[in-house]
Amino acid sequence: HILYTLLFIWLLPVTSNGQPAGKEKLRVISYNIWNGFEHDASRRANFINWIKGQQPDILAMTELVGFTEKDLGQLASEYGHKYYAIVKEEGYPVGITSNEPITVVKKQMEGFWHGMLHVKTHGLDMIVTHLSPHDWKFRLKEAQMLTSYIQDNQLDNCMVMGDFNAYSPIDADWVETHAQLIENMQKWDAEQE
């Protein structure tokens, strides 16, 4: 429940776009590229074409497997973003690109499964993370760390994005009808105890 609360609470301030009245709305996308596109050129090309069509102002990405900061910059340039940041260059990095300058506020690995990246762009604080895929108790600790970080730093105009490895209430009916998924989730939790 804390994950949903966390997302809901910090999305509210940006529903008004976080910008002065009269400005256009901000277009933001959070996207999991699934294991660095698995080195599949056609998946990468399809992603770039789709992103070009969406024209986001800000794009957060998870699972930037195999990406360096330079690689992320190259990808960003292919859909028109000049600014980018990545939390790390090994494992399963998270990153963000923007059509406006980015200021990196914090890159944190400690306490996070894949890391937490905090940047400022478009006048907003943007946090990108990828929570534990295996252990709900660890995810809960990560969510609590995010909540504390946001409160301690008084981030009033903040958006948290990424892969929370949690199902939305919208998915509940689907999850309940797929026994194998439920079995897998229970198995993963048991393996972590």
Tell where the protein language model's regions lie, with residue ranges.
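Sec-dependent N-terminal signal peptides
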Residues: 2-12
